[in-house]
Amino acid sequence: MAQILKGAPVVAAMNEANAARCAALKEKGIVPTLAVVRVGAREDDISYEKGIVTRCGKVGVEVRQFHLAEDVTQEELLDVIRQINGDASVHGCLIFRPLPKRFDDRRVQEALAPEKDVDGITDGSMAGVFTNMPIGYPPCTAQACLEILKYYNVPLSGKRAVVVGRSLVVGKPAAMMLDRENATVTLCNSRTRDLPALCREADVLVVAMGRRGAIGADCLREGQVVVDVGIHVNEEGKLCGDVRFDEAEPIVEAVTPVPGGVGTVTTSVLVGHVVDAAS
């Protein structure tokens, strides 16, 4: 049976490190601070925000919440972002998305200063990921995949890594970050020919297709480490991933669970970015 790569121990280790770094910064008079910008009152946004506030509080990061009415104009939202950009006491900013359809999403993203883009949504942050330059921050979910692999001492240098999914949120940045660790990376998508055969070649398989149960036994072999980024609700109302866990567990060497895997680590990555920005 596979080793289950749970996110909880990774989170605990990251929280401990972030708390120590926060304490050191506060001794210098610096309080790491995150601005959270939310338009409207979607239940999932509110729930996620509560989780962020709790996680930040545990390590000593201050949170400033900017709650805007559902009917706020784009210019009013941009004014808030400009205010955050100009406030030296705010080190990072998280803008809840998706925004209402009337907004120019790209214009809003690019209004944020890359040095405060702790969620990795700006072109500047993407440039940093793809050029390995210290510009902005990687998308949190992509980095969470790497944090799990590093915590569990999964060797990457010289290994074959296959990433299934090419979004700018997970797939492409994860591929670049694996390449930075000297893995040989293949980036696939839903139209890749003979996808199962390519997946079976992987030593490390990262699945971020956004399709429930898309990867099963025909894509897997013994000795693999599988990172499942997907999160869905099945017919029974239970959370599940892009990988059919019941088929993967008896075959592979190690696999992340859903829930309890990548998703649990993402917020700690965000908090770590805020501390980095304050340092």
Locations of the language-model features?
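Anion-binding alpha/beta catalytic cores of soluble intermediary-metabolism enzymes, centered on
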Residues: 92-156
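Glycine-rich phosphate/diphosphate-binding loop of Rossmann-like nucleotide-binding domains
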Residues: 39-54, 127, 136-225, 234, ...
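Short beta-strand segments enriched in small/hydrophobic residues
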Residues: 31-40
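Short, well-structured alpha-helical segments in soluble
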Residues: 76-88
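Short, well-ordered coil/turn residues at beta-beta hairpins
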Residues: 96, 208-209, 229
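Rossmann-fold NAD(P)-binding glycine/threonine-rich loop
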Residues: 106-127, 230-279
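Short beta-strand elements in bilobed, periplasmic/extracellular small-molecule ligand-binding domains
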Residues: 56-70, 185-187
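Positively charged, low-complexity intrinsically disordered leader regions
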Residues: 1-30
